[in-house]
């Protein structure tokens, strides 16, 4: 079977009110960008027609403006975990418009696997390449892994993949994809030296669970640090004085 190539708008049309979506990435690195932006546009259209449309978003860490920012501004987020740094999103949370859980990032995949955050409907993943081997598909992640293997395995409605040409296919091989056991059966992670590998360089799924592939070329939404002001400069001086 070949993979079904669709547009970001066609992918967004698959997402329904109340769905829970899990995203790849960790900070803005490796986060899907074209589909979340289209989901925000869909939400605006639904709201203009008087229809309810809000989704739950699970990620590995923070995301960029095309996800947290646009979706928050479109009033499209019902629940969000575990972490964000987006100013627009923060404003909507503080206005009591979004339910937000600031979980410890290292516990996020475990919380999902053990059912504390409900069922995952869709996984939306950014990849540099997708290969098919028999009935299996190999998803090669881009700049970050995050909760990708967990949400890909648990997404009950399917997996949507953004193949982002901004990231070179030389990314293939940089990841060591591995899921630890759930409590109380967790065993030691057998990494004894920096060169040890315990998983696979890709996320493996049943090929028929991939409902569409979107081709795009979008850079990661990296943020620059703000220039220091008088207050942050004084904080730095205080810390330096304390240490010295």
Q: Which residue ranges define each predicted feature?
A:
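Conserved alpha/beta enzyme-core scaffold
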Residues: 1-244
């Amino acid at each position: 079977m070949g993979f079904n190539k669709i547009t970001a708008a066609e992918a967004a049309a698959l997402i329904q009110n109340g769905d829970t979506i899990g995203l790849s990435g960790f900070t803005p690195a490796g986060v899907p960008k074209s589909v979340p932006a289209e989901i925000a546009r869909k939400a605006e259209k639904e709201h203009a027609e008087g229809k309810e449309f809000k989704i739950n978003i699970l990620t590995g860490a923070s995301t960029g403006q095309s996800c947290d920012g646009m979706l928050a501004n479109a009033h499209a987020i019902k629940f969000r975990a575990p972490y964000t740094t987006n100013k627009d999103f923060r404003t909507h949370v503080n206005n009591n418009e979004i339910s937000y859980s600031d979980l410890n990032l290292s516990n996020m995949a475990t919380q999902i696997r053990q059912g504390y955050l409900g069922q995952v409907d869709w996984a939306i993943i950014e990849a540099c390449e997708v290969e098919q081997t028999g009935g299996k598909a190999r998803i090669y992640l881009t700049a970050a892994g995050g909760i990708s293997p967990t949400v890909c395995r648990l997404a009950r409605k399917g997996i949507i993949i953004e193949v982002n040409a901004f990231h070179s296919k030389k990314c293939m091989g940089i990841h060591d994809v591995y899921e630890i056991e759930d409590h109380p059966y967790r065993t030691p992670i057998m990494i004894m030296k920096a060169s040890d590998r315990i998983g696979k360089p890709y996320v493996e799924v049943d090929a028929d669970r991939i409902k569409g592939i979107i081709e795009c070329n979008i850079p990661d939404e990296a943020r620059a640090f703000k220039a220091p002001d008088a207050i942050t400069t004084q904080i730095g001086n205080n810390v330096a004085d304390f240490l010295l």
